[in-house]
Amino acid sequence: MSEVKVSAKMVKELRDRTGLGMMECKKALEESNGDVETAIDNLRKSGQAKAAKKAGNIAADGAIIIAQGESKAFLLEVNCQTDFVAKDENFTAFAETVANIALENNVTDVAAIAELPYGNDQTVEEARVSLVQKIGENIQIRRVEVLEGANIAAYRHGLRIGVVVSYEGGSAETGKNLAMHIAAFNPVAIDDEDVAADLLAREKDIIEAKARESGKPDNIVEKMIEGGLRKYLEEVTLLRQSYVMDNEKKVGDVLKAEGVKVLGFKRLEVGEGIEKKQEDFAAEVAATQALANK
């Protein structure tokens, strides 16, 4: 069989269909003897291998996507390794598509979402692998949160923070401002009763330990603990926080005046709980120089 000459037109077609670099496309076409479809199959196979290698890299950047239906909203976090890729239109298009697929199918389990149809005869997982091949970074669908309610306000701060809040009464503007407040102040609960018992107990232990270090009498220590817990609850409960639109007022007072009741909220921030690798550039240079001197 004679070898087919790879033309610029063939390379362009493969680039358009895969998004890969010119030299990668040229090499793939040479290996497939000019057959574009075979080249694509081979690249997908190598892409899966490449994706497996990339999976070990820490994906601590990314985007929060909000997909809203009539009575529910989905928050989806999709991670990549750098903020440069987080802003890439291919990455954001993938993340937005996955969020809408999750909403349409009412699926909140990440593993189950991966198996859903994505389009172009691909599953979500296959589309993710293809994107890893194209972009060259580890990309992961990390988590999904869903909130149901008749009135849901949503707010996204850049790509990094997403909030949805369910409420009764008031206006759409009030709901939007409430979502903005939650994005900015990151409450852990609506009110005191909603704060998790283990979280409150842990905070009390910390406050008590610090209070007892003062060496003051027990009755004073008890007052210090009481004051410390009150301050903590003012910081972490939505209704006790100072309102983002008017810090002279508490959120609870503003909502009461407007006849608004908060039923629930969800807030996601990119990379929460992920330990990002810190690069020591000076150490890297020193190690490189040491190797060069051997």
From Swiss-Prot:
Q: What's in the keyword line of the UniProt record?
A: Cytoplasm, Elongation factor, Protein biosynthesis
* Keyword Nucleotide-binding recorded: no
Cross-referenced PROSITE patterns, in alphabetical order?
A: EF_TS_1, EF_TS_2
Lineage, top-rank taxon, reads Bacteria
Q: Gene Ontology terms, cellular component aspect?
A: cytoplasm
The compartments listed are: Cytoplasm
The record describes the protein's role as: Associates with the EF-Tu.GDP complex and induces the exchange of GDP to GTP. It remains bound to the aminoacyl-tRNA.EF-Tu.GTP complex up to the GTP hydrolysis stage on the ribosome.
Q: Which family does it belong to?
A: Belongs to the EF-Ts family.
Tell me which HAMAP family the record gives. Answer: EF_Ts (MF_00050)
What is the designated name of this protein?
Answer: Elongation factor Ts
Q: Which organism is it from?
A: Psychrobacter arcticus (strain DSM 17307 / VKM B-2377 / 273-4)
